[in-house]
């Protein structure tokens, strides 16, 4: 976003996104003069009406964090392109194995490689994928990429790098100035993780289907927020964009409140209490007090995060062990 928006610019972003991304857009970037309008991505009119003359990008997640809600990527891409804007999509939860957003109109795709790509929660890293399809000159809005750059002897990145203009600009300018470069060993670990990505994702998806079914039929569960369920508002979008399954990070609301949620979490043995996700190990967290703790009560409610909301990241352990562990948590809440 730092490479797209400068002081005085504006971003349109999906409201239900990772707490860290929300705070980057809502608080950190405002210190640099960049503002963000957060929208209900399911309301296409709201998305389009939020676009201003100084808007530089539309930002989505293929699967929202933590509830795995799904935007209509094709439709929002059409809106962004109508206004000469790039569509930026965080595909961390979707993974390149399950969905390829560029095929649905995305111009830039980002991943937290720490998650599914690395797969083991051992390495911090990120990936930016430039589709090479966006015309940085057409709208006249992206002078930092299209116009001559004085720090590189008047070179225009759009002219010099062609389809790779955006990522070349990031490598030459942003990484130069921030030093955000991973070590060779961390790069090795991430490359090693990609070798087993398909195998791991298949197991994640298989286990998730069974856990969702277990929770949906459990008497101590108030609600399961998973798009594979027929009554989920994004079920049709799930079938469209994720025909091979997905959303192994999702939430459910336990009957009760914060106390019941904490007791459930504290009595799990296989699930690790960690803010990380997309690990081969099953993970659990209480979003309202951790990953999204910087949001106020109204902001939490807008993202459908409550004090009884629990986020699960389903790992690759044997499904019988996973379900037995969850049942032990429910038993503890019952006082057994």
What is the predicted function of each stretch?
Residues 8, 19, 26-27, 53, ...:
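PLP-dependent enzyme catalytic core of the Aspartate aminotransferase-like
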Residues 129, 251-253, 313-315:
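Short hydrophobic/aromatic beta-strand micro-patches
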Residues 178-181, 185-187, 192, 196, ...:
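Conserved small-domain helix->loop->beta segment predominantly found in fold-type I
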Residues 1-218, 225:
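Conserved PLP-enzyme active-site core in the AAT-like
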Residues 133-134, 195, 231, 255-257, ...:
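Short, glycine-/Ser/Thr-/acidic-enriched flexible segments
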Residues 63, 92-94, 229, 255, ...:
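Active-site beta-loop-alpha junctions enriched in small/polar residues
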Residues 121, 244-246, 305-308:
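Short glycine-enriched loop/turn motifs at secondary-structure junctions
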Residues 129, 278-279, 285:
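Positively charged, small/polar-rich N-terminal and surface patches that mediate targeting and assembly
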């Amino acid at each position: 976003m730092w490479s797209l928006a400068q002081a005085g610019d504006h971003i349109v972003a999906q409201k239900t996104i990772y707490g860290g991304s929300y705070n980057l857009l809502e608080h950190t970037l405002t210190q640099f003069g960049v503002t963000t309008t957060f929208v209900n991505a399911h309301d296409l009119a709201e998305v389009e009406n939020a676009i201003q003359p100084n808007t530089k990008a539309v930002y989505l997640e293929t699967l929202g964090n933590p509830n795995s809600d799904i935007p209509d990527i094709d439709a929002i891409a059409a809106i962004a392109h109508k206004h000469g804007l790039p569509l930026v999509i965080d595909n961390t939860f979707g993974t390149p194995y399950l969905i390829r957003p560029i095929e649905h109109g995305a111009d830039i795709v980002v991943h937290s490689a720490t998650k599914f790509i690395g797969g083991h929660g051992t390495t911090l890293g990120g990936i930016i994928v430039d589709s090479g399809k966006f015309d940085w000159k057409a709208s006249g809005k992206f002078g930092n990429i299209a116009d001559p750059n004085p720090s590189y002897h008047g070179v225009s990145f759009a002219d010099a790098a062609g389809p790779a203009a955006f990522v070349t600009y990031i490598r030459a300018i942003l990484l130069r100035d921030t030093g955000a470069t991973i070590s060779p060993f961390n790069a090795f670990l991430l490359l090693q993780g990609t070798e087993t990505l398909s195998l791991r994702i298949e197991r994640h998806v298989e286990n998730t289907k069974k856990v969702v079914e277990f929770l949906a039929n459990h008497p101590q569960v108030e609600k399961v927020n998973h798009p594979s369920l027929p009554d989920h508002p994004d079920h049709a979008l799930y079938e469209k964009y994720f025909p091979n399954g997905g959303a192994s990070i999702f939430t459910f609301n336990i009957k009760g409140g914060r106390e019941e949620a904490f007791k459930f979490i504290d009595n799990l043995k296989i699930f690790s209490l960690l803010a990380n996700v997309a690990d081969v190990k099953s993970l659990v967290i209480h979003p309202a007090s951790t990953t999204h703790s910087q949001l106020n009560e109204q902001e939490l409610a807008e993202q459908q995060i409550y004090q009884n909301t629990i986020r699960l990241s389903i790992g690759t352990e044997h499904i019988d062990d996973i379900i037995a562990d969850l049942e032990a948590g429910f038993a503890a809440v019952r006082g057994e």
